[in-house]
Amino acid sequence: MTITDNSAGTSDEVGYDILHVVPPQSAPDWIKDSPVRKADDPNGYVDVDPNTLQHTQWPEIFSLGDAGSTPNSKTGAAIRKQAPVLVDNLLAAMEHRRLTARYEGYASCPITTSRKTMLLAEFDYSMQPAPSIPLIDTTHERRDMWYLKRYGLPAMYWNLILKGRA
């Protein structure tokens, strides 16, 4: 694969066994064009403390998921872990209490390695493994992880996550 840096006029050839391409991501224009955005962020995300999810300038503003400036992957797994932190901290702020809930950067990415195997890359802000399934090594490709992606995660999304139960 060739990686080209158009601004520097350079390119490098890089070999790989597995290529995981992440598309460019940014906040919507209405956030990018607002004062809540992080000033030095070209992607225009809402400027939040990465652990409390509270805005760094306006304490009544919280953000999570694809809109927040947390320095982690923008994944469904991340927002699933951010939502309870935001709710706890928002309620604490409304009651003038200290914000004690903390988001540690958990994110997850299911990586399909064949037609019937997958591994589940789970990590935190330090980019260290952060496994969430007890007794199962999700860092190596497994058939049961493929079944999780194919059947378990869609069911979890539609029946639990969207209803605030997971």
What are these regions (language model features)?
Residues 1-13:
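Conserved beta-strand-loop-beta-strand element in the redox core of flavoprotein oxidoreductases
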Residues 16-81, 91-92:
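FAD-site-proximal beta/loop scaffold in flavoenzymes
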Residues 29-31, 107-112:
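Central beta-strand plus flanking loop segment that forms part of the substrate or channel wall
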Residues 44-62, 113-133:
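FAD-binding beta-loop-beta segment adjacent to the flavin cofactor pocket
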Residues 58, 105-106:
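A structure-centric signal for secondary-structure junctions around beta-strands
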Residues 75-85, 117-122:
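Short, electropositive alpha-helical surface patch
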Residues 79-105, 111:
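Internal hydrophobic alpha-helix adjacent to the cofactor/substrate pocket in enzyme cavities
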Residues 120-166:
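C-terminal auxiliary extensions adjacent to catalytic cores
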